């Protein structure tokens, strides 16, 4: 889904087609939060993003489970966008699920944006997928504000070794 009313919660003010980059956009200026930035740097309204994530992600996961008659307790793992551990822990608490069902990799890789869900699967769950079929709910959320939730079963996938450049 998407909620365009939150378009400015995570935004790069210039660049692209909406506001094309001009030379003066690269000059550092004092921003509302007291930090010096140029207009090409991303800005985030942290509390708006936090509120969005901890409200929308659990709701989306519950809607998916209801639509497909899944019991949340029967899902092996919940693989969430690895943006912020506090956000993911709040989502986990709202779903009333154990810590073991929420793998993390952000301590190693940080916020890897759209790569965070597959990266978490290959670094945290790959070995277990060779031993048994795993039921997984993935939920990503971010810029826009936008979100997506998926349920899938993973059994003996072909997963390449992690390549670090």
Give names to the regions the model predicted.
Residues 54-59, 65, 73-165:
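Claisen-condensing/thiolase-fold acyl-transfer catalytic domains that form or cleave C-C bonds
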Residues 1-51, 55, 59, 153-165:
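Condensing-enzyme catalytic core mediating Claisen C-C bond formation in acyl metabolism
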């Amino acid at each position: 889904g998407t909620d365009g009313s939150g378009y400015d919660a995570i935004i790069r003010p210039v660049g692209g087609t909406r506001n094309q980059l001009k030379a003066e956009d690269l000059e550092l200026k004092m921003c509302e939060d007291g930090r010096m930035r140029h207009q090409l740097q991303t800005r985030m309204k942290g509390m708006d993003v936090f509120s969005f994530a901890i409200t929308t992600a659990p709701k989306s996961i519950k809607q998916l489970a209801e639509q497909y008659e899944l019991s949340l307790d029967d899902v092996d793992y919940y693989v969430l966008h690895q943006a912020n551990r506090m956000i993911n822990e709040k989502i986990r608490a709202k779903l009333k699920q154990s810590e073991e069902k929420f793998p993390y990799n952000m301590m190693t890789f940080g916020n890897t944006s759209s790569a965070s869900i597959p990266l978490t699967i290959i670094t945290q769950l790959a070995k277990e997928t060779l031993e048994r079929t795993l039921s997984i709910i993935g939920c990503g959320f971010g810029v826009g504000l936008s979100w997506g939730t998926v349920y899938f079963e993973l059994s003996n996938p072909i997963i390449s070794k992690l390549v670090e450049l």
